[in-house]
């Protein structure tokens, strides 16, 4: 039985595809049971986030997993297969270690993914689809992720626009839990920013977008409210932080709109983060006394500094992961040898029992104990050495040379002629 990882993520698939193969939480149990009812899949766990859908499973026939994924989501395999990756055992182990450690995330080193992996494991345990291999794999996965985060600086520096946006907001407002945040737009950048801000538990989150359906998707994920784009000016005074990133060719937030908002707020400060190119917020807004306006260029300076510090941490993390992959593979190989070890010990025990019974009978008849013990030891040697000796005698040519080396290694023998 081999371990595999199959899936797609933000590196390989656009959002339109990722949405179609995502697993809704209420359907996850059914999916796990359905997958493991495939005759070839023995164990399984499913990780499904906004950025990735991955199956971790034990099988001898991994090709059936892709068929199952497409079938479960009522998609032609040809539609999803160009975006899929399938990792065999060593690569699968390394992949899940990297995912949980944040090395494969859209935001390098982000901590949320570890919690998402733990949730995926918990759901698989509750569904009864975890077995010995996956239990051990994820036990090691969590240990590796903890080691990476505790011994490297992988999560210590800001390396994304989203993280930088939160960082700059926290410079102005000491407690984000007391602030109200408005997101204008509902694309991937806004979704990523929302993930960071939601982690700081603001008092209120709202999403304004031209397309209400898309805004609903983002709002549902983060417990936010949906707002029409045409009421942003009216509602602006009620928000302390505004993050905007749309594809609009013209500014959405103008100077007059912000001036009225500041007046209504009685000059309480407001942080505005404009991630759009071209800008969503008129540049003149930044000249207002109570407005802290940051653009893409401002955030890029923070990100660049973080990236430089992060490179060494990535190298250190990869070294840890490679070492732990080898350790896990060693455990798997040792586990594969367990049945043979048991059979070998059982064979030796059978020989011992037979010879001991014979010796006991001889002693009961009054035979010389020394002779009985001598016969016992010779009997054990002859029977235990019979199979290896016959194997050597029956081997020929290169096979005999290999057999000789194997026996010498097994019994720690020297190769001297005498």
From Swiss-Prot:
Catalytic activity from the UniProt record: (S)-4-amino-5-oxopentanoate + tRNA(Glu) + NADP(+) = L-glutamyl-tRNA(Glu) + NADPH + H(+)
Residues annotated as the enzyme's active site: 50
Binding-site residues for substrate, renumbered to this chain: 49-52, 105, 110-112, 116
EC number: 1.2.1.70
Keyword terms of this UniProt record: NADP, Oxidoreductase, Porphyrin biosynthesis
Biological or metabolic pathway of the protein: Porphyrin-containing compound metabolism; protoporphyrin-IX biosynthesis; 5-aminolevulinate from L-glutamyl-tRNA(Glu): step 1/2
CDD domains: NAD_bind_Glutamyl_tRNA_reduct
Family: Belongs to the glutamyl-tRNA reductase family.
Anything else known: During catalysis, the active site Cys acts as a nucleophile attacking the alpha-carbonyl group of tRNA-bound glutamate with the formation of a thioester intermediate between enzyme and glutamate, and the concomitant release of tRNA(Glu). The thioester intermediate is finally reduced by direct hydride transfer from NADPH, to form the product GSA.
Notes on the domains: Possesses an unusual extended V-shaped dimeric structure with each monomer consisting of three distinct domains arranged along a curved 'spinal' alpha-helix. The N-terminal catalytic domain specifically recognizes the glutamate moiety of the substrate. The second domain is the NADPH-binding domain, and the third C-terminal domain is responsible for dimerization.
Descriptive protein name: Glutamyl-tRNA reductase
Protein species of origin: Aromatoleum aromaticum (strain DSM 19018 / LMG 30748 / EbN1) (Azoarcus sp. (strain EbN1))
């Amino acid at each position: 039985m081999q371990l595999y990882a199959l899936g797609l993520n933000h590196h390989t698939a656009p959002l339109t595809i990722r949405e179609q193969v995502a697993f809704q939480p209420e359907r996850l149990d059914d999916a796990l049971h359905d997958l493991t009812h495939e005759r070839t899949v023995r164990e399984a766990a499913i990780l499904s986030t906004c950025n990735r859908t991955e199956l971790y499973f034990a099988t001898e026939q991994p090709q059936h997993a892709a068929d199952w994924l497409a079938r479960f989501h009522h998609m032609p395999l040809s539609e999803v297969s160009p975006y899929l990756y399938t990792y065999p055992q060593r690569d699968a182990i390394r992949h899940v270690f990297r995912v949980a450690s944040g090395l494969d995330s859209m935001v390098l080193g982000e901590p949320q993914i570890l919690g998402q992996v733990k949730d995926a494991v918990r759901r698989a345990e509750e569904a009864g689809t975890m077995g010995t291999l996956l239990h051990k794999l994820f036990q090691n996965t969590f240990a590796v992720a903890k080691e990476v985060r505790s011994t490297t600086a992988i999560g210590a520096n800001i390396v994304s626009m989203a993280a930088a946006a939160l960082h700059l907001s926290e410079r102005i407002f000491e407690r984000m839990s007391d602030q109200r945040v408005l997101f204008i737009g509902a694309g991937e950048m806004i979704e990523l920013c929302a993930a960071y801000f939601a982690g700081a538990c603001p008092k209120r989150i709202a999403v304004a977008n031209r397309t209400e359906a898309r805004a609903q998707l983002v709002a549902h994920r983060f417990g936010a409210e949906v707002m029409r784009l045409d009421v942003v000016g009216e509602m602006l005074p009620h928000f302390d932080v505004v993050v905007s990133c749309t594809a609009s060719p013209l500014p959405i937030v103008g100077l007059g709109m912000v001036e009225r908002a500041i007046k209504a707020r009685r000059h309480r400060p407001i942080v505005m983060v404009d991630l759009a190119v071209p800008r969503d917020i008129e540049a003149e807004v930044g000249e207002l006394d109570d407005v802290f306006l940051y653009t893409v260029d401002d955030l890029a300076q923070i990100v660049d500094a973080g990236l430089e510090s992060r490179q060494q941490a990535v190298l250190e993390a990869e070294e840890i992961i490679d070492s732990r992959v080898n350790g896990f593979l060693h455990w798997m190989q040792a586990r594969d040898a367990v049945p043979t070890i048991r059979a070998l010990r059982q064979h030796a025990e059978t020989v011992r029992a037979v010879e001991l019974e014979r010796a006991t009978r001889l002693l009961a008849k009054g035979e010389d104990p020394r002779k009985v013990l001598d016969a016992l030891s010779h009997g054990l040697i002859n029977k235990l050495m019979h199979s290896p000796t016959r194997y050597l005698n029956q081997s020929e040519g290169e096979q005999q040379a290999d057999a000789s080396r194997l026996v010498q290694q097994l019994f720690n023998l020297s190769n001297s002629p005498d």
